[in-house]
Regions:
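Short C-terminal tail/terminal secondary-structure segment
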Residues: 2-5, 151, 228, 239-251
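Conserved glycine-rich cofactor-binding loop
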Residues: 13, 20-21
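Conserved glycine-rich Rossmann-like NAD(P)H-binding loop of the short-chain dehydrogenase/reductase
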Residues: 34-51
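Substrate-binding pocket helix/loop in short-chain dehydrogenase/reductase
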Residues: 104-105, 112-114, 208
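Active-site helix of classical SDR
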Residues: 128, 163, 171
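Alpha-helical segment proximal to the catalytic Tyr-Lys
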Residues: 133, 176-180, 236
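A conserved structural motif in NAD(P)-dependent oxidoreductases
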Residues: 212-223, 234
């Protein structure tokens, strides 16, 4: 696709919802490696967030960790505003925050249902709306969805799949709103990826590997590399798309 030398994000500023672990941390480090200043939100571990900042700064980059719950619209807006106040601009938004609640239909609580929508859908809209206030031509928005929008090979995942399906429509609609301003928005749909929240071992993981042509989980660095391409100038003609990176999970 492309290499480190052809993706240049110097003088760009990125904000990542959910950047202290897993895919989000990999994206934060990857964008910083290509020259972007990176701010990211996190909700739990101060230590983990500080480590991501330390790793980026040790490599010569600039990073800012902001504690903010993506279920809180005001907190997300404030985090984006703080990013701009700190770095002077905003060019890239990555909506990576998400929750996965799985339970039998009869047992799935309305509290879990509402929180799934608040984080997986509403926060994407809120952050995109706020970020668009600051973005100029060449701005990039990336939503991290899931191939579960298209395929759910396990029980109990209906609300999660619904929330990720919503991002497909939201991405298409916002592409119409933002396109005339030269801002692109795309939806990246990872398949199973090896993270601390979704480890690539155990019976559940093996059941998923068995239906995948590549027979393995993805790596968070692979998702980060794809995102880095999509936010680069080279991807300027891609918008409104939902793009799977899933080892053939949805084939």
């Amino acid at each position: 696709m492309t290499n480190n030398q052809t993706i240049v994000l110097d003088n760009k500023v990125a904000f990542i919802q959910g950047g202290s672990r897993g895919i989000g941390a990999a994206i934060a480090k990857r964008l910083a490696r290509h020259g972007a200043a990176v701010a990211f939100s996190y909700v739990s571990s101060d230590e983990r967030a500080a480590q991501v900042v330390k790793d980026i700064e040790a490599a010569g980059g600039h990073a800012l960790a902001i504690k903010a719950d993506s279920a809180d619209a005001a907190a997300i807006k404030a985090a984006i505003d703080k990013t701009v106040a700190t770095f002077g601009r905003l060019d890239i938004l990555v909506n990576n925050a998400g929750v996965l609640a799985i339970a039998p239909l009869a047992d799935f609580s309305l509290e879990d249902f509402d929180r799934t929508l608040a984080i997986n859908v509403r926060s994407v809209f809120v952050a995109s709306q706020e970020a668009a206030r600051y973005m100029t031509e060449g701005g990039r928005i990336i939503n991290i969805g899931s191939t579960n929008a298209d395929r759910v090979p396990f029980a109990g995942g209906g609300p999660y799949a619904m929330s990720k399906s919503a991002l497909v429509g939201l991405t298409k609609g916002l592409a119409r709103d933002l396109g005339p301003r030269g801002i692109t928005i795309n939806n990246v749909q990872p398949g199973p990826v090896d993270t601390d929240m979704n480890p690539a071992n155990g019976d559940f993981a093996e059941s998923l590997k068995a239906i995948m042509p590549l027979g393995r989980y993805g790596k968070d660095e692979e998702i980060a590399g794809f995102v880095a391409y999509l936010v680069s100038p080279e991807a300027g003609y891609i918008t409104g798309a939902s793009l799977s990176i899933d080892g053939g999970f949805s084939a």
